[in-house]
């Protein structure tokens, strides 16, 4: 949904044609919170062990476009606080360069499967001007799930340039499975099913 919003923005002049959409799954960094901060805000060579080159950071890479932080509830409060400060004016510091202030004009989008009021700092939550609640698959009707499955199958057919047909057993399994990872997991299951 977020990427479609970005594409809509590009097609309607909100973002330039060169604007980038950068997706970060914060849960991948849950066991290494320092790494997500370094990758978001960037770092200078020698800032820490293993920093052999400068890294501009994903905030800079997405400058002029959109940075989507998925599973944002996995961010530690220290990183959320840095995001809050960045959202205030678009300025930030790169790890290993506290003297210079950097700027990025990036649209931030967040998603969480948790209750945002319980997992996000109030300072960060107040800065999010538009909040949408998208129901999980478990809360959707069978018709809605069916429409989502059909849409993903059509998209996958276009992607692999083949007609895709599934039997009733596979369809029932797709429809009735409990997807903890929600729509992203359903999409992955459909992609894997179509590859086999």
Model-derived segments and spans:
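Walker A/P-loop
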Residues: 1-24
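Conserved AAA+/SF3 P-loop NTPase catalytic/coupling segment centered on the Walker-B
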Residues: 3-4, 29-41, 52-88, 117-127, ...
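AAA+/SF3 P-loop NTPase mechanochemical coupling elements
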Residues: 17-20, 54-64, 76, 82, ...
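Conserved AAA+ ATPase "SRH/arginine-finger" region at the nucleotide-binding site
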Residues: 25-27, 130-145
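NAD(P)-dependent short-chain dehydrogenase/reductase
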Residues: 41, 146-159
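Short gly/ser/thr-rich secondary-structure transition/capping motifs
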Residues: 47-52, 89-94
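Short conserved motifs of the RecA-like P-loop NTPase core
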Residues: 161-179
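C-terminal helical "lid" of AAA+/P-loop NTPase domains
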Residues: 172-175, 184-196
